[in-house]
């Protein structure tokens, strides 16, 4: 993780391709890296766990998670080629061998995974419809396979259809600071 934080990789790429909002690049660690690591705080993935990162953009949450869990396998997908190029180049520069970056829409992804992760890509009901086909029925972890999403704001209406099965954890449980007060991790077994 230290290599990611010390490296000018994202800053350099962001000056060429707007992967992270230019006004937010100074908050890279808190708003992107640390936020992504809320998933690692919530679940210690077992070795050989497979994870699909949907709408990864520049590699979040996939790249920080791949660093934290080197014995797990990650597939990062995004439909925008320039974003996948950045994620791929950052992963290569960091020497990450446990992830693959693909330019594709999640609808095109055929593989099965233990978990699907995402950061504020689309409304939860839409995401559930798209990724349900990608969840494996072989379990490796202490919890059932499913969807783990990082989101912010008022999620009441979005989570309402899943209120009986979803587990919602505020990110402020693990991280201090005003920015995390509205951020939540949503787990939905599928």
Q: Where are the predicted features?
A:
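Class I SAM-dependent transferase core
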Residues: 1-52, 82-99
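Conserved SAM-binding loop of SAM-dependent methyltransferases across substrates and taxa
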Residues: 58-71
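Conserved SAM-binding motif I beta-strand of class I
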Residues: 73-78
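Conserved SAM/SAH-binding loop
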Residues: 102-108
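A short acidic, Gly/Pro-enriched loop at the edge of an enzyme's catalytic core
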Residues: 108-115
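A short SAM/SAH-binding and catalytic strip from SAM-dependent methyltransferases
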Residues: 115-134
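Conserved beta-strand signature within the Rossmann-like core of class I S-adenosyl-L-methionine
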Residues: 139-156
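Active-site capping/gating segments
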Residues: 154-190
């Amino acid at each position: 993780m230290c290599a990611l934080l010390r490296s000018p990789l994202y800053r350099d790429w962001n000056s060429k391709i707007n992967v992270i909002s230019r006004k937010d690049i100074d908050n890279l660690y808190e708003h992107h890296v640390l936020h992504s690591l809320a998933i690692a705080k919530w679940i210690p993935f077992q070795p050989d766990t497979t994870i699909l990162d949907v709408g990864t953009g520049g590699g979040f949450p996939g790249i920080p998670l791949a660093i934290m869990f080197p014995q797990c396998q990650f597939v990062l997908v995004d439909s925008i080629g320039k974003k996948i190029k950045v994620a791929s180049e950052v992963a290569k520069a960091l020497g990450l061998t446990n992830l693959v970056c693909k330019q594709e829409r999640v609808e095109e992804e055929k593989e099965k995974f233990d978990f699907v992760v995402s950061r504020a890509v689309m409304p939860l009901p839409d995401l559930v419809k798209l990724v349900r086909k990608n969840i494996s029925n072989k379990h490796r972890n202490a919890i059932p396979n499913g969807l783990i999403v990082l989101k912010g704001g008022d999620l009441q209406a979005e989570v309402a259809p899943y209120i009986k099965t979803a587990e919602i954890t505020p990110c402020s449980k693990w991280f201090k600071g005003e920015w995390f007060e509205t951020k939540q991790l949503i787990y939905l077994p599928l």
